[in-house]
């Protein structure tokens, strides 16, 4: 008898809309391959009842808090249900951009220069301290919450007068923030399937930066796969992405985002343990370049579940 698979989608995070799209796409891909897959919106159905409902395996298509931060993974471990993607520790760590960066720095991987600020500090931040950050990092800057994905809560800061407002906007989403140097150069992403880096993708948003709308709704964002890198640079990027992915304990599948500066050097941004699987998403694009259809991709991800 075929395994009954739950495709977890929707949920309650800031990325609910995207998760619904990802989940429906995954569901269609699994069913195309003859898999007995069913949609489960965790907003309406208690995850603790999955086993009682006869499910034997879980495909996680949730994004953001409660879905890719280790919380859900811990529940599924307790229920002894195999699930896709990274485990508890890697999911929790990867969701936290600040602590992920600290791990990468600790093993000598390159990250974009940054300072971290928490909500207790911000009330005491003087204008002179803000000026110090700007002096250290230069303008423009990018301000982002540590614990949100899909560019939620991010703001580009072009003038020092905009910095305090950007911090306040980001604090609506998290108590820890990153203020990063703005890197002038292309953004790349590397999808990882098992222990293999798929062909890199170069991202060219029409807007100022690759924000939530550019990722999921814009028809003007351009993606290049192959990315146009030389064979040597492609290999260098693949090795960096794999090392970054494995160093925080990721497994199954994921995606590593990287910037290149004007000198051609790569800087790690973040790792995503439950990437989007919508029509605009990047992992399916990289998989196509590697010869995998969408249905073959989701079946492979499911096979890697443990």
UniProtKB/Swiss-Prot annotation:
Top class in the EC scheme: ligase
Q: Name one GO molecular function term.
A: ATP binding
Q: Where does Mg(2+) 1 bind?
A: 257, 270
Q: What is its main location?
A: cytoplasm
Positions with a binding annotation for ATP: 134-189
Q: What is its EC number?
A: 6.3.2.4
- According to its UniProt record, which reaction does this protein catalyse? 2 D-alanine + ATP = D-alanyl-D-alanine + ADP + phosphate + H(+)
Which pathway does it serve?
Cell wall biogenesis; peptidoglycan biosynthesis
Where along the chain is Mg(2+) 2 bound? 270, 272
Where does the UniProt annotation locate this protein? Cytoplasm
Keywords, A to Z, come to:
ATP-binding, Cell shape, Cell wall biogenesis/degradation, Cytoplasm, Ligase, Magnesium, Manganese, Metal-binding, Nucleotide-binding, Peptidoglycan synthesis
Is-annotated flag, keyword Metal-binding?
Answer: yes
Can you supply one Gene Ontology CC term for this chain's record?
cytosol
GO BP annotations of the record are:
cell wall organization; peptidoglycan biosynthetic process; regulation of cell shape
Q: Which domain of life is it from?
A: Bacteria
UniProt-recorded name of the protein: D-alanine--D-alanine ligase
